[in-house]
Regions:
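Conserved active-site segment immediately N-terminal to the catalytic lysine
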Residues: 123-157
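Conserved core segment of the aminotransferase class I/II
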Residues: 151-178
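PLP-dependent aminotransferase-like
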Residues: 36-125, 132
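Phosphate-binding glycine-rich loop
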Residues: 1-45, 59-63, 68-71, 136
Length: 178
């Protein structure tokens, strides 16, 4: 992107407290870039909730991976940790949390579970860009997080999305894919 896009990325890095902020033309493209960056291969599984926009699952299908649907908590509508754990198999590559209605997923439990099973976590925070989890912005505690900038979201640029990560390698891969 040009100088204004780069300026916007730097501002997002400062605001969200992330090492890298990477703009994309849509949040769907952001999810596709995030999934590609973690090295998903055909047949790999990514655990996600069906309680979200279809882009969360279709971005998984873009890489010929398989979305595995886990239940949600009734109070937050975010992933239920016990359901996520019950759905982990030898084919599971990642967990995609969906922060929704201003609620953050239980990131301590998700990251602990991911570490236990050597999985990556992608946080789809399109519906909760200002939500806090232990004084940190939702989306910044996962390996990769991101936000929709669509015209009907809290922060908008007309269209687009922004990925955040603190991992240099993942950031470079996402820049190549976008």
């Amino acid at each position: 992107g040009g100088p204004k896009v780069q300026e916007f990325e730097r501002e997002c890095e400062r605001y969200f407290g992330a090492k890298h902020a990477i703009t994309v033309n849509s949040w769907t493209s952001g999810l596709i870039a995030a999934i590609g960056a973690i090295g998903v291969e055909p047949g790999d599984e990514i655990i996600v909730t069906p309680w979200t926009m279809c882009a969360s699952a279709t971005a998984i299908l873009h890489w010929n991976a398989i979305p595995i649907f886990a239940d949600i908590e009734t109070e937050t509508f975010c992933l239920d940790i016990a359901s996520v754990e019950a759905n982990i198999t030898h084919k599971t590559k990642a967990i995609m949390s969906v922060d929704i209605f201003g609620h953050s997923s239980d990131m301590d439990s998700l990251m602990s579970l991911a570490k236990k099973h050597n999985l990556k976590v992608i946080s789809d925070t399109a519906q909760a860009p200002g939500a806090l989890y232990h004084e940190k912005y939702a989306g910044t505690l996962a390996d990769i997080g991101g936000y929709s900038l669509n015209y009907h979201k809290h922060i908008h640029t007309g269209e687009g999305g922004i990925l955040v990560t603190n991992d240099d390698d993942l950031a470079n891969r996402m820049r190549l894919i976008r």
